[in-house]
Amino acid sequence: MLLNGGARFIQLRDKEASARELLDQAMTCLELTRKAGATLIINDRVDVALTAGADGVHLGQDDLSVAEAREILGADKIIGVSTHSIAQFRAALETTADYIAVGPVYPT
């Protein structure tokens, strides 16, 4: 449905799935995104992104560092990082992240 509606950047996020379950989901999503010419990003799990052949990974503050993920995935993969404060945003600017997501900076 998202792909039919024109979405071209998809993030697979399932915090409850096992590595095997997430890999299965990633493979299914990858097949669909490839057919649609869309990009697939895996949330948190560099290992799953690498094994599935996804386009990249989105990292949280408690995940591997951007530098570690870049070393594993290589220069051609997309790496994004979440930030939740001005200090985290500034730190993310100093990395090789391809994009920076800004989460709640102020109380919500």
Predicted regions and their residues:
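Conserved N-terminal beta1-alpha1 strand-loop-helix module at the mouth
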Residues: M1-V66, E71-D98
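Active-site/ligand-binding-proximal alpha/beta "capping" segment
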Residues: D98-T108
